[in-house]
Amino acid sequence: RQGGINFIVNAEPDSFAQRFARLHGPSICAIAFRVNDVKTAYERALSLGAWGYAGVAGPGELNIPAIKGIGDSLIYFVDKWRGKNGAQPGDIGNIGFFDVDFEPLPGVGADALHAPGHGLTYIDHLTHNVHRGRMAEWAGFYERLFNFREVRYFDIEGQVTGVKSKAMTSPCGKIRIPINEEGNEKAGQIQEYLDRYAGEGIQHIALGSTDLLKTVDALRAAGVTLLDTIDTYYELVDKRIPGHGENVTELKQRKILIDGKAGELLLQIFS
């Protein structure tokens, strides 16, 4: 856990997660949306055509409802989290899902979610890769069930392959899901993912940082492998993005990518 990011590594034998891993390999088998009321959100989703998933809760665990999402994955509904509706530490009822279903490690307090870690603070987006011709269908899935709206559309035609993408965003603006498909019949990186994953699914998770340079330094020091970028990329930054205001030497040293325009920059790096 770090900032507003919570990952669960599920190694439970004979579980949905284990069966999912056998089919798709190491991947994302489920995500969870925070909602004000689980019962209302779940029943609404079912009434709009979602397929429910009947999970089995262990003794003392919360019974968390879920629906079937993209590529055999699940979408859970959670309405218990620390700080909900402005609750403060020590307030009655200020407990979360992790307080009920998990036990903290020795020496780790209940407020470990505030640990500084490597400067990662939130989940920026969850990119879905789908078969060609299915982008609109999955965009409609999130629009119909969760009132997401399309905020951007891309149709990028490369020399060999292309990509089409719809960027969907939740009403609160905190959940962003780009949905990608191949832009033409020539197989590219999206089809490569579909082949390796054995179907449609969540291709990557993007994590936000308040200081990407410091975060990259910390991640590399911790042994995390990040993708390289050729030096000539940085020779063209000033021409490609006039007035960007970033220190290109610092970006080059860390192999951080820069896109956008002055005042609307995106700094990113891939693992």
What are these regions (language model features)?
Residues 155:
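Active-site and NAD+-binding cores of ADP-ribose-processing enzymes
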